[in-house]
């Protein structure tokens, strides 16, 4: 499972020698206290590490090089306790390869009205010191997150936490490998894309494999490993009649376990962080992998169907961002609509592969026919998803840029039971309503595959898109279709011109 405590962000404070050793000692002391306070926050999932106060261009530049090379450092949190002339920061910021957050705070929460003097004023200058730093970062057109408020406020911790989760996902993507079994679902457009461009911009690589490469691992799975996995199934899930040992469909369950283990061994052997399958490339497999992808997603792997490598990478990023939370994150597809008088809703599902982390109750293992793929009836988990606020996101390629589209939704219970629907599913109300949300999504070119999460918010996704240099579009309760279309037009112009700015 994913553990974000292995990562750290460095808390860096800017000042200058002008203030003298006594003031600089106070700056360092205050910075250590703030860093320790953030590090001890139960909200922030990574370590926050104090670094010595930066007073010269060389100190700044060398610190940035150190951060770039540090494997566990996923970003910098900068603060100007005093005034730190920003030309000192140019060389360092120009070399920075890690995400940057700017914490606009001060050590004291209130003005000490009866005690304030010029010593206090000279020490506590973040109100204008951070403005100087903000200018140079904007002048250099560097992306960063600006967080304003007192460092002890819970809201500030929440905003830092969201950014650190996004930074962790970005860090995880650098050098990540994704396996694509078979190719794209034939003639589908949105799941295609420029994998070289994705590696250049997002850091991960996508490698294609014939299904025979997977089949070799599947065929090498031992009976003992299958027996052990079947015991896990019996402990974690309800088993439909016929799947228990000696049942008429027990062989299907053993085959599902064999495929799951083969997939897992392949991914572990190649150090992959996610994968795709497609029902059009199944030669040598008895079933379409269904239960295996469900359980592997639950372990933190990214997954998408039909060769959709962009969504598999997005699901992995969302899994990393949501590590340690308990709401759940899954691959998803907008499947069918309810245009009912009691609220227009979307029923989300897929052929088989929805992650059990979003299940409302204990999943049930069932075997049912699958009309595509031409293989034996596959095993899958069947369940209803949880309810509550969620995000439903897609990454698409627009030629000159990658676009992340986020639809904010509210998952609800189904109006009635679904006894004949043999797949896991989620039902939601898109914000502000289905007509507006669907129109905006279609105008934006959003895919039919998504990453769906109860753990993440729009802030996480916006932070991730900003770090990754992706266009970000949000569909929520404030969306107006005409204004959204204008935003699309403005963005087209911006991204056409931005490289020349």
Curated annotation (Swiss-Prot):
<feature type="binding site">
    <location>
        <position position="350"/>
    </location>
    <ligand>
        <name>Mn(2+)</name>
    </ligand>
</feature>
<comment type="similarity">
    <text>Belongs to the arabinose isomerase family.</text>
</comment>
<dbReference type="Pfam" id="PF24856">
    <property type="entry name" value="AraA_central"/>
</dbReference>
<dbReference type="GO" id="GO:0005829">
    <property type="term" value="C:cytosol"/>
</dbReference>
<feature type="binding site">
    <location>
        <position position="306"/>
    </location>
    <ligand>
        <name>Mn(2+)</name>
    </ligand>
</feature>
<keyword id="KW-0119">Carbohydrate metabolism</keyword>
<dbReference type="InterPro" id="IPR009015">
    <property type="entry name" value="Fucose_isomerase_N/cen_sf"/>
</dbReference>
<keyword id="KW-0479">Metal-binding</keyword>
<dbReference type="Pfam" id="PF11762">
    <property type="entry name" value="Arabinose_Iso_C"/>
</dbReference>
<feature type="binding site">
    <location>
        <position position="333"/>
    </location>
    <ligand>
        <name>Mn(2+)</name>
    </ligand>
</feature>
<dbReference type="InterPro" id="IPR055390">
    <property type="entry name" value="AraA_central"/>
</dbReference>
<dbReference type="InterPro" id="IPR003762">
    <property type="entry name" value="Lara_isomerase"/>
</dbReference>
<dbReference type="InterPro" id="IPR038583">
    <property type="entry name" value="AraA_N_sf"/>
</dbReference>
<dbReference type="GO" id="GO:0008733">
    <property type="term" value="F:L-arabinose isomerase activity"/>
</dbReference>
<dbReference type="InterPro" id="IPR055389">
    <property type="entry name" value="AraA_N"/>
</dbReference>
<feature type="binding site">
    <location>
        <position position="449"/>
    </location>
    <ligand>
        <name>Mn(2+)</name>
    </ligand>
</feature>
<dbReference type="Pfam" id="PF02610">
    <property type="entry name" value="AraA_N"/>
</dbReference>
<dbReference type="InterPro" id="IPR024664">
    <property type="entry name" value="Ara_Isoase_C"/>
</dbReference>
<dbReference type="InterPro" id="IPR004216">
    <property type="entry name" value="Fuc/Ara_isomerase_C"/>
</dbReference>
<comment type="function">
    <text>Catalyzes the conversion of L-arabinose to L-ribulose.</text>
</comment>
<comment type="pathway">
    <text>Carbohydrate degradation; L-arabinose degradation via L-ribulose; D-xylulose 5-phosphate from L-arabinose (bacterial route): step 1/3.</text>
</comment>
<dbReference type="GO" id="GO:0030145">
    <property type="term" value="F:manganese ion binding"/>
</dbReference>
<dbReference type="GO" id="GO:0019569">
    <property type="term" value="P:L-arabinose catabolic process to xylulose 5-phosphate"/>
</dbReference>
<protein>
    <recommendedName>
        <fullName>L-arabinose isomerase</fullName>
        <ecNumber>5.3.1.4</ecNumber>
    </recommendedName>
</protein>
<keyword id="KW-0413">Isomerase</keyword>
<keyword id="KW-0464">Manganese</keyword>
<keyword id="KW-0054">Arabinose catabolism</keyword>
